[in-house]
Amino acid sequence: RFTMIYKFLVISCFAASVNLFFAEEINKSNLFDYFDDKKYLSAEFTQRTLQDGYERTVKGTIKAVRDGKFKIIYFEPMQEVIGSDGKSIFRLDYELEQMDVLPQEDYFKNTPISIFTSDVSSLSSLYQISSCDMVENTTVCEITPKSNDAFLEKLFLNFRNFELEELSYTDSFGQTVTLSFYNLSWLSFPNEDLEISIPKEIDIVYH
């Protein structure tokens, strides 16, 4: 079940205050600069996962900060919360009544969530920008991890009308995952928004 952690690390149509320069000129040389002043992310999303001809759709919310912290809430049918305090990964499964706690090791940096939790200099060391092309009024940028042992194979960022509206990726599990964002904001939020409330009946398991 811990592969679920990788499925979500995925993540992440962003806010109102977007620099028009990037809307018009986004390309391989300035893609990561687009995120330079965007320290916070809040959004709702629809996630579609395609594997072996079967597609599953789930909705959720995400909040992330570039100091490594994040919180993702999946609604029905998953009913899970996955988050990080920058040191550990927490996965709360309401159905199992269990929260797993794992160390946030370096290999988590090579997952899609790092687009929103790593600083821009780290993004340049983690990923190689393969292309940024205009496709039907959408700028599609493809990036690949520099690490040979990353579970992520390819990641695509889609920009339209000055905003990043979709993130998709393929991974070593044979999945294609697409996150479509809406009600996205780059504005800051209190640290309390990243806290995970643990019901009394939940068992905590450390790994």
Feature annotation, model-predicted:
Residues 19-24:
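Sec/Tat signal peptide C-region and signal peptidase I cleavage site
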Residues 43-45, 70-74, 89-92, 143, ...:
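Short hydrophobic/aromatic-rich beta-strand segments that constitute the beta-sheet cores
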